[in-house]
Amino acid sequence: MLKQAVEPTGGFSFENCQRNASLEHVLPGLRVPHARKTGTTIAGLVFRDGVILGADTRATNDSVVADKSCEKIHFIAPKIYCCGAGVAADTEMTTRMAASKMELHALSTGREPRVATVTRILRQTLFRYQGHVGASLVVGGVDLNGPQLYEVHPHGSYSRLPFTALGSGQGAAVALLEDRFQPNMTLEAAQELLVEAITAGILSDLGSGGNVDACVITAGGAKLQRALSTPTEPVQRAGRYRFAPGTTPVLTREVRPLTLELLEETVQAMEVE
């Protein structure tokens, strides 16, 4: 009977998870590594002539703003784009993989890529890792079936919707889209609604911020617009706060000498031939 020479292994290793759980149980007060909170607001909607996608531009590292102008709308095909929320590295590499596969698919078949094909590739890839690839995606594009919009979750589930929003600011964005969305909207009305939805997510979520980027996709092509709107203008300081020495009184002062005790001293001569 034939057997595999090497056992198949997954792309992730969780060997240290049980170790961390044991250490946390044995050593009270131990701070084990925790999952990072990610923040983003991405949205998309279908209008009369195509699809429009939008995203904020803030990238965070826990409570630190790592990038104020992060591009979250990724190219997949000439008429298909994808917004990514979650771990920036995961969304970037996942969309790059999908773009390369669609380029090979177009060269081998001689046909333009379809939005459903891109969505299938993305959800199969994410389902394979069972949610450990932190990428929440909004895929939009125009093909021979007309304008289409999909949302793909990190575990591989997906939905086709006329409008959607994902990320930590999706609550405020979806509320605005549900209230004001109408079928067969004009480009101007759809763009205004999208900017207001992303702005609502930025103003209600600390993980979202920066500018509003948008991508308009029609049968004639796609147009990516960077910094379409700036909801929060940077505020300049009113002045410099430098206080002279002695402004704040010192209430108490205590100096403790640092005493060191030499426990053992060993001197070993080097052997020289």
UniProtKB/Swiss-Prot annotation:
UniProt-listed Gene3D superfamilies: Glutamine Phosphoribosylpyrophosphate, subunit 1, domain 1
Catalytic activity: Cleavage of peptide bonds with very broad specificity
EC number, UniProt record: 3.4.25.1
Residue stretch(es) of the prosequence: 1-39
Entries under InterPro entries matching the protein: Ntn_hydrolases_N, Pept_T1A_subB, Proteasome_bsu_C, Proteasome_bsu_CS, Proteasome_sua/b, Proteasome_suB-type
Gene Ontology annotations for the cellular component aspect, listed alphabetically: cytosol; nucleoplasm; proteasome core complex; proteasome core complex, beta-subunit complex; spermatoproteasome complex
Enzyme class of the recorded protein, top EC level: hydrolase
Site (Cleavage): 39-40
Upregulation: Up-regulated by interferon gamma (at protein level). Up-regulated by IRF1.
Post-translational modification: Autocleaved. The resulting N-terminal Thr residue of the mature subunit is responsible for the nucleophile proteolytic activity.
Pfam families hit by this protein: Pr_beta_C, Proteasome
Gene Ontology terms, MF aspect: threonine-type endopeptidase activity
Any GO BP: proteolysis involved in protein catabolic process
Active site per the UniProt annotation: 40 (nucleophile)
Annotated positions of the N-acetylmethionine modification: 1
Mutant lacking the gene: phenotype: Impaired response of cytotoxic T-lymphocyte (CTL) to dominant epitopes of lymphocytic choriomeningitis virus (LCMV).
Location in or out of the cell: Cytoplasm; Nucleus
Tissue: Detected in liver (at protein level).
Similarity comment: family membership: Belongs to the peptidase T1B family.
Role played: The proteasome is a multicatalytic proteinase complex which is characterized by its ability to cleave peptides with Arg, Phe, Tyr, Leu, and Glu adjacent to the leaving group at neutral or slightly basic pH. The proteasome has an ATP-dependent proteolytic activity. This subunit is involved in antigen processing to generate class I binding peptides. Plays a role in determining the T-cell repertoire for an antiviral T-cell response.
PANTHER family on file: METALLOPROTEASE TLDD, PROTEASOME SUBUNIT BETA TYPE-7
Protein name (database record): Proteasome subunit beta type-10
Organism listed in the record: Mus musculus (Mouse)
Lineage summary: Eukaryota, Metazoa, Chordata, Craniata, Vertebrata
